């Protein structure tokens, strides 16, 4: 009997839960050991808070006010072989005059090339996690009838070291990992995750103005192109075994030409 693989939750869900806990502690002056969050796919998760720390206003010793709160949630990727499994995702929140300001801190990448989910200069916190985080802040502010604003900074202390093992440097995301997730759940051994990455790379090449793209199942074809023809690998995309799906994406994105290269045995398999 085949073992059912265990699902996990995304870095976006970790950031969402850590933010909810931190804002609750900031505005409610309470301790929080765990939080329950609703995910975009309507699932509900209860996650433990791995770390929590309050910082007080040191200039008001007679009646110290909480200046900021930092909470962390530990990432659980389930049975998916994800390098981010077990890392701590932190959210530090503080009061501001108005609005909700969200940014990335240590270990969260910064976008340096066009064509990605976020504009150049933004922290690599994708749209859905941003929405999840802002939703939690808004709801907690409403709960405590807080009329001011909140600043949220998401950090991943291990993020900069881990980023070298991801697609981020190739995509132009510098300094850390991305805060990701569309459903909030990590599906183990997901083909969709790899297809999504291929789509992001192709969209980026198109946004940079390239009309011709080289694709290859792996390193063999790309190294051949570089060694034999001096081809710029910044204009290429690895497609693994998803050659057909990648060709469909190339067509949909409006590239005028595509070059497919690879080991003959791999291509005809």
Indicate residue ranges for each PLM-predicted region:
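A structural signal for small-residue-enriched, beta-sheet-centric alpha/beta enzyme cores
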Residues: 6, 171, 177, 182-269
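Generic N-terminal targeting/processing segments that precede catalytic cores or assembly contacts
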Residues: 1-165, 169-171
């Amino acid at each position: 009997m085949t073992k059912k693989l265990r699902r996990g939750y995304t870095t976006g869900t970790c950031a969402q839960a850590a933010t909810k806990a931190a804002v609750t502690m900031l505005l409610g002056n309470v301790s929080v050991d765990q939080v329950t969050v609703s995910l975009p796919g309507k699932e509900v998760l209860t996650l433990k808070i791995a770390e929590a720390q309050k910082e007080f206003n040191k200039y008001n010793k007679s009646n110290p006010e909480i200046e900021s709160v930092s909470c962390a949630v530990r990432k659980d990727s389930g049975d998916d072989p994800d390098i981010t499994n077990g890392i701590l995702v932190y959210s530090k929140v503080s009061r501001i005059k108005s609005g909700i300001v969200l940014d990335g801190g240590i270990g969260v990448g910064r976008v340096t090339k066009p064509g990605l989910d976020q504009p150049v200069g933004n922290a690599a916190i994708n749209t859905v996690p941003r929405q999840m985080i802002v939703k939690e802040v808004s709801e907690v502010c409403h709960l405590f009838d807080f009329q001011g604003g909140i600043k949220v900074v998401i950090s991943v202390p291990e993020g900069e070291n881990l980023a070298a093992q991801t697609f981020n440097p190739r995509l132009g995301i510098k300094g850390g990992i991305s805060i990701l997730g569309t459903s909030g759940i990590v599906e183990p051994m997901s083909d969709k995750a790899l297809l999504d990455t291929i789509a992001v790379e192709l969209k980026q090449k198109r946004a940079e103005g390239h009309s011709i793209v080289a694709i290859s199942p792996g390193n063999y074809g790309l190294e051949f192109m570089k060694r034999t023809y001096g081809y710029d690998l910044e204009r290429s995309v690895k497609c693994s075994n998803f050659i057909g799906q990648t060709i469909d994406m190339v067509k949909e994105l409006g590239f005028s030409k595509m070059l497919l290269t690879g080991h003959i045995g791999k291509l005809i398999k």
